């Protein structure tokens, strides 16, 4: 008897690649077509109803937007570039993803297999280019295994919370492979279970907190799900809270015992308290300036909670470490304590925060004088929805947004945290609106950062992404100019540039826009922008002064360390006549100033 043979069905390898992406929940990706990536473009065209191609105007924007996808959602972001320059243009965004530990997949075009290693047009050995940025970096060598390679790349990106790069010779996706041979492992992928907090370690940590005279809780984005526990522990034990800048908003900015963040992108109360604390509890924190700033020189006990064993003891010698989830560990601490009476340390910090916030409000509420960033950010706060998302570029805008944006746990904000590449504002806003179309999205950028990716305002228009873009124009790289003031011996160099009228740039890509240079213009213009952004993107170009924001890391307020003339000059320059140092409130509540004691080098 002759068995009837079933006819084998085939599928294009490129179609299988797209189906693997779909299986992992990818619903859009970014890039620019090229001859070496056209086979993937062909497959995308066939699946356009299920996965959307977003055409950016520079591959860098695609990679930055993919990184922003991952930062906002936790899901993998995907971008692509053609062989040679298309792929290398992705690098800034890929490094941003690597440094902020988020999963991104980059597909790189390559000349067909018959022309590889022949010095053909735009053909080169691409693997070494991506060796540093990627946790997984391979070139596909045959069509049959191509879907598996893509699946493996995604699993590795998730597992390592980093970048995966796959170079794809252009002929492979057009080849037929057996339809039953490809699969995606998305439905079987699992994240590791987080360790439970060790009871004895939690007890020791709790006892140390209770014995402290000047305790401080310093949390990072690893505590993103523990906002309620952080605030409750702070209230119960009367411990002030401070965060890294990326963790802003985990606890509402309005919380009276929230001090802000430290170092330079900082708020004054945080820097001052950190220098005085005797016990610091690090929660999900990888503060990158600990070693260079000597932030913990008066710290007697350093405590740490983290899910990553590599982080324990990384930034400071740690006395008690708990390898566990932040939320569970904080809940375990709360279970061991009861509410304490107010302490002098607690009262001094509350008073210092109140004084600092009054200073910030005095800048924001000015009704006359030249337009400054502070009044513009007040206008942003006025029209912001409770769950607004902010994509913030890099530079002085980080420092000012850190101080003047009023965030709660309902908000999200993203920037390039550790890599700190300029130009991320526009790409991040594109990603935010694609992922959360129902939420209000702001792009906040200085003119330096905005000029790096301004061509992709056109992408917002093309895909009808109603972003409110606010550009802070002062014709300088302000953050670097301020550094030069502190470090250089000679005049400023390379930090000032000619004006760009961003309202005209926006008009050129068919986006409604405004240009303002007076405080009194802000209310009406921002209300108009909010109305426009119900349906389409809009841009406000705010021409502001080049004033340096108050340097919280270089305070001249305390008579123990600064002359009366220096203090007066500092207050005049930064409009800070009523601003007081923490030492004023320490003295008021009967505490010594450890920071300024002669010979004080720790406990």
Curated annotation (Swiss-Prot):
Spell out the InterPro entries in the cross-references: DHS-like_NAD/FAD-binding_dom, POXB-like, Pyruvate_oxidase, THDP-binding, Thiamin_PyroP_enz_cen_dom, Thiamin_PyroP_enz_TPP-bd_dom, TPP-bd_CS, TPP_enzyme_TPP-bd
Cofactor(s) in the UniProt record: FAD; Mg(2+); thiamine diphosphate
The organism's place on the tree of life at top rank: Bacteria
- In this chain, the stretch annotated as FAD-binding covers 192-342
**Catalytic reaction list:** pyruvate + phosphate + O2 + H(+) = acetyl phosphate + H2O2 + CO2
How is the cofactor bound, in the record's words? Binds 1 FAD per subunit.
Top class in the EC scheme:
oxidoreductase
Q: Name one Pfam family in it.
A: TPP_enzyme_C
Annotated residues that bind Mg(2+) are located at 447, 474, 476
Molecular function (GO) terms for this protein are: magnesium ion binding; pyruvate oxidase activity; thiamine pyrophosphate binding
**Positions of the UniProt region annotated as Thiamine pyrophosphate binding:** 343-603
Enzyme Commission no: 1.2.3.3
Record's keyword terms, sorted: FAD, Flavoprotein, Magnesium, Metal-binding, Oxidoreductase, Thiamine pyrophosphate
- Quote the entry's note on domains: Each monomer is divided into three domains, each of which contains a six-stranded parallel beta sheet surrounded by alpha helices.
Annotated function: Important for the aerobic growth. Decarboxylates pyruvate in four steps. The energy released is partially stored in acetyl phosphate.
Question: Member of which family?
Answer: Belongs to the TPP enzyme family.
Identification of the protein by name: Pyruvate oxidase
Origin species, per record, is: Lactiplantibacillus plantarum (strain ATCC BAA-793 / NCIMB 8826 / WCFS1) (Lactobacillus plantarum)
Tell me the gene name.
Answer: pox5
């Amino acid at each position: 008897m002759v068995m009837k043979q079933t006819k084998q069905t085939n599928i294009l390898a490129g179609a299988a690649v797209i189906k693997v992406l779909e299986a992992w929940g990818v619903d859009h990706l970014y890039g620019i077509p090229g001859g070496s990536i056209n086979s993937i473009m062909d497959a995308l065209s066939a699946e356009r109803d299920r996965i959307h191609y977003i055409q950016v105007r520079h591959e860098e924007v695609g990679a930055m937007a993919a990184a922003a996808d991952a930062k906002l959602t936790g899901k993998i972001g995907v971008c692509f570039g053609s062989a040679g320059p298309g792929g290398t243009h992705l690098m800034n965004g890929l490094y941003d993803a690597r440094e902020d530990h988020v999963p991104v997949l980059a597909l790189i075009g390559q000349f067909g297999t018959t022309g590889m290693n022949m010095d053909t047009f735009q053909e080169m050995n691409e693997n070494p280019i991506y060796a540093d940025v990627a946790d997984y970096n391979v070139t596909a060598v045959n069509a049959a295994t191509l879907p598996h390679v893509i699946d493996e790349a995604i699993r590795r990106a998730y597992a390592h919370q980093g970048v995966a790069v796959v170079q794809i010779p252009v002929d492979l996706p057009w080849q037929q492979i057996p339809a039953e041979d490809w699969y995606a492992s998305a439905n079987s992928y699992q994240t590791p279970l987080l360790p439970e907090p060790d009871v004895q370690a939690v007890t020791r940590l709790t006892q140390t907190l209770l014995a402290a005279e000047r305790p401080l809780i310093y949390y990072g984005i690893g505590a993103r799900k523990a906002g309620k526990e952080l605030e409750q522990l702070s209230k119960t034990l009367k411990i002030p809270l401070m965060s890294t800048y990326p963790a802003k908003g985990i606890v509402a900015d309005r919380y009276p015992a929230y001090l802000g963040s430290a170092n330079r992108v900082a708020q004054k109360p945080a820097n001052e308290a950190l220098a005085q604390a005797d016990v610091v509890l690090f929660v999900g924190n990888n503060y990158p300036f600990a070693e260079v700033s000597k932030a913990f020189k008066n710290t007697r006990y350093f405590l740490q909670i983290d899910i990553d064993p590599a982080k324990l003891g990384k930034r400071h010698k740690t006395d008690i470490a708990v390898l566990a989830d932040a939320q569970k560990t904080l809940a375990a601490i709360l279970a061991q304590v009861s509410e304490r009476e107010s302490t002098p340390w607690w009262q001094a910090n509350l008073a210092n925060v109140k004084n600092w916030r009054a200073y910030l409000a005095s800048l924001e509420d000015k009704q006359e004088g030249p337009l400054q960033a502070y009044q513009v950010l007040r206008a942003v706060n006025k029209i912001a929805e409770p769950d607004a998302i902010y994509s913030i570029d890099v530079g002085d805008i980080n420092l000012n947004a850190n101080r003047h944006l009023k965030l709660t746990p309902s908000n999200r904000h993203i920037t390039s945290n550790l890599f700190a590449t300029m130009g991320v504002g526009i790409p991040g806003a594109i990603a935010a609106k694609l992922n959360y179309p129902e939420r209000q999205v702001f792009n906040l950028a200085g003119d330096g950062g905005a000029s790096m990716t301004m061509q992709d305002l056109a992408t917002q228009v093309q895909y009808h992404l109603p972003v409110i873009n606010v550009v802070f124009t002062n014709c300088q790289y302000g953050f670097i100019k301020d550094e030069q003031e502190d470090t250089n011996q000679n005049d400023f160099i390379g930090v000032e540039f000619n004006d760009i009228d961003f309202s005209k740039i926006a008009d050129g890509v068919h986006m409604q826009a405004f240009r303002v240079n007076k405080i009194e213009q802000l209310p009406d213009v921002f209300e108009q922008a909010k109305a426009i952004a119900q349906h389409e993107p809009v841009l406000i170009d705010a021409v502001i002064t080049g004033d340096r924001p108050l340097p919280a890391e270089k305070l001249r307020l305390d008579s123990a360390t600064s002359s009366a003339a220096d203090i007066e000059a500092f207050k005049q320059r930064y409009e800070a006549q009523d601003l007081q140092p923490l030492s004023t409130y320490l003295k008021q509540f009967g505490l010594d100033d450890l920071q300024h004691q002669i010979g004080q080098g720790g406990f």
